[in-house]
């Protein structure tokens, strides 16, 4: 019995000692030190490197966290290296190289912040293992940053690429080959290349859908530095590389019946002056309407139902022409739905709209009525804003309650279906319930400027200016706004993206340095320098 007790005590002691070696004693000081690399085989910055396996030893147990996103190998390898262990703690990291290495090349295995100690997760920041297959280690550096071209969205894990400008370079290389050097912003917007070779380079940034370091214009965002990078002259890029999505070349996709009397035509890219014309013979009573769907590459085509089993259309734009057939099947007509864009409060400067899902062919103003809280009739007009949108126009009085009613058959759509009785109630607020933002815009560019007021990234109001002037955004609901200025270099009143092959940078967008936290009955004045 005593022998058994002695064995248990010894085993318990061994377990306690073992645990003590991996963790800190209860009540001891917290370990705040990052792991330290003790040795590497082959050694760090080895030249004439010709091995397939690398073993790195640390002063404590480490784990690898987020390695798939943190690890950047430059130049990139065709076959990713096998790095172990992952998921368990160890004092060693093993790297197995599966690819054939280039001659006379400096390689960098940048682990980012993936190497952390096992107990307190202290990060060994920007840990690298470097070697060269040639006679020396390249040592030049390049730093910079990236930014979105149009929005203020936060960027991270942006791939930054360097292509050597030699006799083999063509612009098409970015669509086919991996770069000569690779970096990443990881969790920030900054990047740094190290161990670069002297020479001239193209500098690119990619926000990729897949991490293959090859540009896919359909899925990826791209940014490029407008000038040639020359090393060792260039070490710091002062202005951020701006990322944008290219507009795709026009490509018609297909036409499909989605409900009875409605076809959707899908396309890709910039539609230009795309025309869709019916070429089938149809009855004299046939009517059709078409409209592009907002923020989608879709044209909706509504028509009075016919007994035919298909319709033929001619599709054309500047560089494309074709004829297609759309099969018609036994589908149901979309019932008429009518919505008011005003919930309960109608802003004093806004218009009351009624929107429908189907095109409106007839509206009868005599079936509309607008009254105030005392049922006093309010003079108004009804105008067709778009094929499926009516504007109710009237002079709004502050702090007033209104009722809008539409009797049956007040609105009739393309399928000759009409509304039931509709009733809407809403009110206006006092002028004091709103605020104003007044900007003294000092324009230091020769181009016109599009001034936009934004609420959570959505455009609330727009002003187009050609010279320095006072821009007033008034009668605004109390909330937080941002303001941006778009330098409209081609004077088409919209923001234009860039294109790599034509070396066109996106139009410059400048956000005012701070948000406007507007309160009721406030007037906020600022100076905005646009250059």
What is the predicted function of each stretch?
Residues 1-19:
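Sec-dependent bacterial lipoprotein signal peptides
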Residues 3-4, 19-206, 218-224, 231, ...:
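Acidic, low-complexity Ser/Thr/Gly/Pro-rich repeat segments typical of extracellular/periplasmic
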Residues 208-217, 488-497:
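Acidic, glycine-anchored loop motifs typical of Ca2+
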Residues 225-233, 505-513:
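Short, composition-biased linear "edge" segments at structural boundaries
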Residues 235-258, 438, 515-531:
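Alpha-helical transmembrane segments and their immediate juxtamembrane flanks
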Residues 446-452:
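Calcium-regulated, polybasic anionic-phospholipid
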């Amino acid at each position: 019995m005593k022998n058994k007790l002695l064995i248990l005590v010894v085993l318990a002691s061994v377990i306690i000692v073992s645990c003590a070696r991996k963790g800190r004693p209860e009540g001891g000081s917290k370990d705040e030190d990052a792991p330290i690399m003790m040795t590497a085989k082959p050694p760090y910055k080895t030249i004439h490197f010709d091995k397939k396996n690398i073993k790195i030893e640390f002063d404590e147990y480490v784990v690898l966290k987020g390695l798939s996103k943190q690890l950047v190998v430059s130049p990139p390898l065709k076959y990713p290296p096998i790095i172990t262990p992952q998921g368990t703690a160890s004092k060693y990291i093993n790297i197995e190289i599966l690819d054939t290495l280039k001659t006379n090349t400096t390689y960098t295995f940048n682990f980012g912040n993936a190497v952390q100690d096992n107990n307190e997760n202290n990060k060994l920041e920007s840990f690298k293992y470097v070697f060269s297959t040639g006679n020396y280690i390249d040592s030049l550096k390049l730093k910079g940053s990236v930014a979105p071209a149009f929005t203020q969205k936060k960027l991270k894990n942006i791939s930054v690429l360097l292509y050597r400008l030699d006799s083999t370079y063509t612009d098409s290389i970015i669509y086919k080959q991996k770069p000569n050097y690779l970096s990443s912003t990881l969790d920030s917007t900054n990047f740094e290349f190290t161990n670069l070779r002297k020479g001239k380079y193209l500098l690119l940034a990619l926000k990729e859908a897949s991490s293959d370091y090859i540009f896919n214009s359909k899925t990826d965002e791209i940014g490029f530095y407008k000038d040639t990078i020359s090393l060792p002259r260039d070490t710091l890029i002062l202005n951020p590389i701006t990322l944008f999505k290219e507009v795709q070349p026009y490509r018609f996709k297909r036409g499909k019946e989605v409900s009875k009397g409605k076809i959707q035509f899908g396309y890709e890219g910039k539609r230009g002056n795309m025309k869709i014309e019916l070429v089938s013979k149809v009855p004299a009573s046939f009517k059709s309407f078409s409209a592009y769907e907002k923020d989608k590459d879709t044209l909706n085509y509504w028509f009075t139902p016919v007994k035919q089993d298909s319709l033929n259309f001619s599709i054309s734009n500047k560089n494309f022409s074709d004829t297609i057939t759309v099969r018609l099947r036994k589908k149901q007509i979309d019932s008429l739905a009518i919505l008011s864009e005003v919930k309960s409060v109608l802003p004093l400067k806004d218009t009351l709209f009624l929107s429908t899902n189907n095109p409106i062919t007839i509206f009868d103003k005599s079936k509309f009525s607008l009254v105030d809280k005392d049922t006093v009739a309010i003079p108004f007009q009804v105008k067709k804003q778009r094929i499926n949108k009516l504007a109710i126009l009237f002079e709004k009085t502050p702090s007033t309650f209104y009722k809008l009613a539409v009797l049956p058959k007040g609105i009739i759509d393309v399928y000759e279906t009409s509304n039931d009785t509709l009733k809407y109630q809403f009110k206006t607020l006092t002028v004091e319930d709103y605020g104003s933002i007044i900007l003294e815009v000092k324009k230091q560019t020769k181009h016109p400027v599009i001034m936009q007021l934004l609420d959570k990234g959505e455009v609330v109001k727009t002003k187009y200016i050609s010279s320095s002037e006072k821009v007033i955004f008034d009668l605004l609901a109390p909330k937080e706004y941002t303001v941006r200025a778009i330098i409209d270099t081609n004077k088409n009143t919209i923001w234009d993206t860039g294109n790599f092959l034509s070396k066109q940078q996106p139009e410059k967008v400048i956000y005012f340095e701070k948000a406007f936290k507007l309160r009721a009955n406030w007037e906020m004045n600022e100076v905005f320098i646009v250059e």
